Structure formats: C-alpha cells, structure tokens
Amino acid sequence: MDHIKPSFHDVLEFVRMFRRKNKLQREIADNEKRIRDNQKRVLLLDNLSDYIKSGMSIEEIQAIISNMRTDYEDRVDDYIIKNAELSKERRELSKKLKAIGEVKALNSVIDKQP
C-alpha cells in the first residue's frame, strides 16, 4: 500500500506543476499584452507630437486627433473582420478534423470485428 501513496503524491505534484506552468503562461501572455499596449501608447504620443506644431489652434489639434481616431477605428474594424474570417476557417477545420477522427474511430471498430 505504501507504493500507491508516493505514486498518488507524484500525480498530485505533476498536476500542481502543470497548473502552475499554465498560470505562468497566462501571466506571461498578459504581461506581453500590457507591454504591447504601452508601447503602442508611447508610439501614439510620439506620432501626435510629430503632427502638433507650436502655434496651432485648438481646433487644428482636435482635427488631427479626430483623424487619428478615425484611422484607428478603421483598423479595429479591419481586425475584427479578419478575426471573424479566421474564426470561421478554424471552425471549418475543427469540423473536418472531427469528421476524420470519427471515420478513423469507425474504421478501427470495423477492423477489430471478426
């Protein structure tokens, strides 16, 4: 009976380590996203400072900001459309893979029959 306990303990340790690894991967991905977001903010401010010149009126600055906003909104829309297309392709592939798996499972059942 003693040999079962260490084995069970090993399984629990494996599960704990696997969960920790997954959590670390999620945290790394979150941090990478935050880094990208902040780098984009810095770039946005750099771009804005390139367009704004001394002596510009508030209306001119607001027009620049409005144009930049429109450009970014258009990009977001483009990415949403692209993401939808990719998701559709992924779903189609999942269906095909599932069908292939079902055919293989059926064939293995048929092959095992006497």
Curated annotation (Swiss-Prot):
InterPro entries, per database record: DUF496 (IPR007458), UPF0265 (IPR053375)
Record-linked HAMAP family:
Pole_loc_TmaR
Primary localization class, coarse: cytoplasm
Its subcellular locations are:
Cytoplasm
Record Pfam families: DUF496
Top-level taxon of origin: Bacteria
Name under which the protein is recorded? Pole-localizer protein TmaR
Q: Which GO terms describe its cellular component?
A: cytosol
Q: Which residues form a coiled coil?
A: 21-41, 69-103
* Function (record text): Pole-localizer protein involved in the regulation of several cellular processes.
Family under the similarity heading = Belongs to the pole-localizer TmaR family.
What's the encoding gene here? tmaR
Recite the UniProt keywords alphabetically.
Coiled coil, Cytoplasm
